[in-house]
Amino acid sequence: MEDGNTTLLTEFVLTGLTDHQGLQVPLFLLFLMIYLITVVGNLGLIALIWSDPHLHIPMYLFLGSLAFVDAWISSAVTPNMLFDLLSKNKMISLSECMIQFFAFAFGGTTECFLLGTMAYDRYVAICKPLLYPVIMTNRLCIRLLVSVFIGGFLHSLFHVLFLLRLTFCNSNIIHHFYCDIIPLYNISCTDPTLNLLLVFILSGSIQVFTIMTVLVSYTLVLFTILKMKSLQGIRKAFSTCGAHLLSVSLYYGPLLFMYVLPASQQTDGQGMMDSLFYTVIIPVLNPIIYSLRNKQVTDSLKKRLERHV
């Protein structure tokens, strides 16, 4: 498409993780294995929660939703990355690029809200155990989950709509392994300052809000644990919160660097490594973390395995 003497680009080239021919097949096999483990692990966790009536409580409904979001994030990025590792044609259209970014951003924002909601759930479970069934009902849980997914959808849609104001005319090379928003801004012919400001304000606000929710919730949880005199109660509290706290710690580190640190301070290599950790590594770790550190999940899994052995 042309506008005067300027050709507007509608197709882009993803540089991918590496252009070293000797590394592409080993990386393909590695990430294919990780992706299969991610999908099987997260969908298996969802199936386990769905099939066990004892796990039909808010805590595990949130966990099942987290497993779905992790599988979604990985599926939004990894299949295309695997294809590009073996393909000589690394082209992607602008519309496909926006769809991929929307899918990824929807999952990322939803997980952000979800981790904050899960922290509040842990706070109620530990600090107000007698009132937990009254406060955290399944009805409230479903309302919270609907709000979380709507929030993720609207935030992602907002950024995609603002992407439409940008034009691309100089370079069609995206130095990344998927269509992320910052690399697109870097090759835009239109001044992306407004878009960058919105990313900083909106993404930063969401992260600050959810991080504060997590910090306040776990500060109150810690005070409650310190008042406990029963060793069994302390162990149960740590069992309830430990997996979620570890998951939160792994999640927010790379995310802060990806979207809050100014783009001028990030290198392409650093950005890709942060994205790789967030889109590939965390989704495969979460079901392992929650399965190994949660007694009810492990007990339910053992029962299912014993029935089929």
Swiss-Prot record:
Role summary: Potential odorant receptor.
Locations listed in the record: Cell membrane
Taxonomic source organism: Mus musculus (Mouse)
Family membership: Belongs to the G-protein coupled receptor 1 family.
Membrane topology field: Multi-pass membrane protein
Bilayer-crossing regions: 29-49, 57-77, 94-114, 145-165, 199-219, 240-260, 272-292
Entry GO terms, CC: membrane; plasma membrane
Entry keywords, A to Z: Cell membrane, Disulfide bond, G-protein coupled receptor, Glycoprotein, Membrane, Olfaction, Receptor, Sensory transduction, Transducer, Transmembrane, Transmembrane helix
Membrane side Cytoplasmic: residue ranges: 50-56, 115-144, 220-239, 293-309
One BP term from GO: sensory perception of smell
Family annotation (InterPro entries): GPCR_Rhodpsn (IPR000276), GPCR_Rhodpsn_7TM (IPR017452), Olfact_rcpt (IPR000725)
Major localization class: membrane
Designated name of the protein: Olfactory receptor 5H18
